[in-house]
Amino acid sequence: MIGKSMRKIGSLLHRAKPSDILDKMREYINLSESKDIAKSYAAGFILHYALDRSCHPYVYALQNKMVEKYPHLNSHTAHNTIEFSMDTYLLTKRLKAENAYLFDTEGTIIFNEAELDELAKMISYVTSNVTNKQVTPNDVKTAIKDLKYIQKLTIDKSGKKENLVKIIDGIAAPFLNNFKFSALMRPKDLEKAKKYGNIERKTWTSPYDKLKRNDSFEDLFEFANLMQSI
């Protein structure tokens, strides 16, 4: 999108300690005049964190295995391939989506102007304080609107977009350390998507605590849901 890139700041925020982020969210909520909106966003962040904390050991274990087997595979591409494949699998199984690749993710990002204003102020406050990089509310608004636009853009009813993106990948990947944009699109092939979910519950090793486990991705998803309900 037109404007300054927030990618590096986003990476800093992604690597920040969750406790630091939550502390700044608490600070902001105490100052906010729209506490209900701010609390709602904070609750969503906590739910997202619970899901990542539960599922990421498996995702990174498989990502590392894929990169070890295929040294030229970009680690981010491997990560995206796993997560978007699981999107296809869970949307099909849980929401009975007939064509998961057509699921309207843009339609799940809903807000009115008051909510957008509050979210922009909150994310600006948290990000600026956690990363020590200046991020304005307008920067945040642009990022949120860009996210909605990208979600809409990746809906591919005819298959033409995927074909075009793969052509772009072929041209650009050598200059981007083999990063592939096509990995950001949910796969159409459900059987292929399933292969990334450890449905057979084979043993894998967590890269964090080195413990051997045999959970499937769906097992970890269920555990995250259980933690969220406590």
Feature names for model-found ranges:
Residues 1-44, 49-230:
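N-terminal leader/auxiliary helical segments
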